[in-house]
Regions:
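A short acidic, glycine-rich active-site loop
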Residues: 19-20, 121-128, 224-233
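Active-site groove signature of glycoside hydrolases
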Residues: 99-118, 142-151, 253-254
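Acidic/histidine-rich catalytic cores of soluble enzymes
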Residues: 41-42, 71, 133-233, 279
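Aromatic/hydrophobic pocket-lining residues that form the small-molecule binding cavity
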Residues: 27, 56, 84-91, 125-132, ...
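Flexible glycine/acidic-rich beta-alpha junction loops that bind and position SAM and/or redox cofactors
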Residues: 15-18, 107-115, 185, 209-221, ...
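N-terminal pre-domain/capping segments
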Residues: 1-102, 122, 133, 140, ...
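Acidic-and-aromatic substrate-binding clefts and catalytic sites of carbohydrate-active enzymes
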Residues: 14, 21-23, 44-56, 77-86, ...
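Residues at the N-termini of beta-strands
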Residues: 41, 102, 203, 250-251
């Protein structure tokens, strides 16, 4: 089997309004545009549950209308463990109901006004480990894989954070989503991280990084240095090669938090790059 190419469509929804009908219209537009560009698989944030919770079949039918598969929903955990687990289980249930297979998740941030990058805080990471272990086990009963995403500005970001989290989570239930841009911001070679985590990788996020802009950025501005594929310095052919070495045949999901022109234009640039540089 070959790797599958996906795109995140939450960026359509944050510009289209959060009232239910506007959100649904934006989601449908993302399906239509991404299918036109050649993306057969789609990811979104778990907040879309708010608009379809009473009728998941409506979202199943929308996927069929455009012949796309919404394979992943993305959740965020703060440090209230019981609340995070309760919310996570509801999101996993909804994901399973619409046919999704992967549940991406991350810490939602430190919850204070302190710096965005900090030494490993074992107390904070332990909370993420406990939440992930419980939800990962639950997800398996629903046919879903939990994939934790190390992310800038959170308690699981650096190499030390990742090592601690990996050592304290169940490898049979808790997997990883490696993000090529966030690892680059952490000073981690994404190729090396792929090889390190190996079979624990169940999902991939592809983003490029403009390191010149990064050198001029501080704090949260660093995430404004992400680019469409091919417009930065990430060696995606090497990333693909490392994934092939570990036998990965899952999803390569392109994400761009802040498109320069529009979601469609950025998605088109990345899709052309994937075809030309990666042969997918």
């Amino acid at each position: 089997m070959s790797m599958k190419v996906a795109y995140t469509s939450w960026t359509w929804m944050i510009t289209g309004g959060r009232d239910p009908q506007s959100a649904k219209n934006a989601l449908e537009a993302s399906f239509r545009e991404l299918k036109h560009l050649g993306y057969d698989y789609i990811e979104n944030f778990a907040f879309i549950q708010d608009f379809y919770a009473d009728n998941p079949q409506e979202l199943v039918d929308l996927q069929a209308k455009y012949d796309v598969k919404l394979v992943n929903l993305y959740g965020h955990f703060m440090f209230d463990e019981s609340a995070a687990i309760e919310t996570g289980k509801k999101q996993i249930d909804f994901l399973a109901a619409i046919g999704g297979k992967w549940y991406n998740c991350q810490n939602g941030g430190f919850g204070d006004e302190g710096p965005s990058e900090r030494p490993t805080n074992s107390t904070m990471v332990d909370a993420m480990c406990r939440i992930s272990n419980e939800l990962g086990k639950y997800a398996q009963t629903k046919g879903v894989k939990l994939c934790f995403h190390p992310h800038y500005g959170t308690c699981v970001f650096s190499q030390g954070d990742i090592d601690y989290f990996a050592a304290n989570t169940d490898p049979g239930n808790v997997f990883f989503c490696v993000d090529t841009a966030h690892s680059t911001l952490a000073g981690i070679d994404p190729v090396a991280l792929v090889k390190q985590l190996g079979k624990r990788i169940e999902y991939m996020h592809l983003k490029d990084v403009d390191t010149y802009a990064l050198s001029k950025s501080e704090g949260p501005e660093k995430m404004g240095t992400f680019r469409a594929l091919g417009l930065g310095v990430v060696n995606f052919p090497a990333v693909k090669g490392a994934l092939e070495e570990i036998g990965y045949d899952g999803v390569l999901c392109v994400e761009l938090d802040r498109p320069v022109i529009s979601n469609y234009v950025s998605a088109e640039i990345s899709r052309k790059y994937i075809k030309l540089a990666l042969g997918l």
